[in-house]
Each structure stands twice: as structure tokens, then as C-alpha cells.
Regions:
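Residue-level recognition of beta-strand microenvironments
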Residues: 58-61
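A short gly/proline-enriched turn/hairpin at secondary-structure junctions
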Residues: 24-27
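Charged phosphate-binding loop/patch that engages nucleotide di/tri-phosphates or the phosphate backbone
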Residues: 129-162
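Small-residue-enriched segments and motifs
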Residues: 1, 53-56
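Short loop/turn segments immediately following the C-termini of beta-strands
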Residues: 16
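Unchanged
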Residues: 31-54, 64-125, 156-161
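Short, surface-exposed beta-strand-loop junctions and turns on beta-sheet-rich folds
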Residues: 19-21
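Conserved N-terminal beta-strand and adjoining loop/helix that marks the start
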Residues: 1-12
Length: 162
């Protein structure tokens, strides 16, 4: 999931280390066990930017393919990313926190600056999400259902009721 954070006409991005070098990305990451997509987005935004973030809308669901060439210790990789992008309200900077491992810095870019830096983006979804946001695309968070089995750590057999 990814947080598309706009404030006063600029977008909050992170500059992060990747196997392809330093890249720009939206605050984004993966699900941890027991959390919903919205909770994961809030957590990732905080870990990567040190800002509180409150998702108000689902911006969209995106897929992109990435091919990483072979390296000395790894074969070619063909990776498909599935991104749930959320937009919402920027909260306060949490003084005393540090940026997540691999994040070099945060930066605010205007739409034109973001477009001009496309070669440095981690994926084409960075630009696509911004353009969709600027077009006013929004979906209600109620579109996403998180079943209670996600939060309940007890094992559930197929066919059991939670």
C-alpha cells in the first residue's frame, strides 16, 4: 500500500536505497500480520516520513511489472507489484522518531518537479498515483472489507466461522 500525501500543492516523497540505486517513492510498504490495508498505510507513512497520516479515501488499486536484471548472486527477477494507494490528511511530524531503514530523506515536490524526476521513480506508479489524485479520483474506504480473521490470531480451518 502507498500513502499519496499532498499538502499545499506539493507531494511528500521518500528517497530510498534500492538495488537500482537511490530512488524516489511514495511512502509505501507491505502488510504486517494482523493489520488492515488502512492500518498498514498509516504505519508505513509514519515509519518512512515520521508524519502521522490519516487515510480518507482509496485513490486506486494499481499493478505494475518490474524486471530486475541478474546480478552476481541472483538470477533475473520478474516482479509484479500490487498497490493499494490511499490519500488523506497529513498529521504532525513526530519529533524524536527516525526514518525507517533504507530511507535517506523525505522531500516535498510540486507536480512539475515530480513529473521531471520520473527517471528516478521507483516505479511508474509514483507518477500515475499523483496524476489520478490531481484528477480528483477518490473512492470511499468502505470499498475495502477487512474480515475479523485478519485481526484474530487464532488459526481458522476452512469452513469455520470466525
Amino acid at each position: 500500500m502507498a500513502a499519496i500525501i499532498e499538502h499545499q500543492g506539493k507531494f511528500l516523497l521518500v528517497e530510498e536505497h534500492t538495488l537500482e540505486g537511490l530512488r524516489l517513492n511514495n511512502p509505501a510498504g507491505h502488510l504486517d500480520e494482523g493489520e488492515s490495508l488502512v492500518e498498514a498505510c498509516v504505519r508505513e507513512a509514519l515509519e518512512e516520513t515520521m508524519h502521522l497520516f490519516t487515510p480518507t479515501h482509496l485513490l486506486g488499486v494499481y499493478m505494475a511489472r518490474f524486471q530486475r536484471p541478474a546480478s552476481a548472486d541472483q538470477a533475473d527477477q520478474d516482479i509484479t507489484y500490487l498497490r493499494f494507494a490511499f490519500c488523506g490528511k497529513l498529521g504532525d511530524l513526530q519529533v524524536g522518531r527516525s526514518l525507517d531503514t533504507g530511507i535517506v530523506r523525505t522531500l516535498w515536490l510540486s507536480p512539475d518537479e515530480l513529473r521531471a524526476s520520473a527517471l528516478r521513480h521507483r516505479s511508474p506508479l509514483v507518477l500515475q498515483c499523483m496524476e489520478d489524485y490531481l484528477r480528483g479520483q477518490r473512492f470511499p474506504l468502505a470499498l475495502i472489507h477487512t474480515d475479523p480473521t485478519i485481526i484474530d490470531p487464532r488459526p481458522i480451518a476452512l469452513g469455520d466461522k470466525a
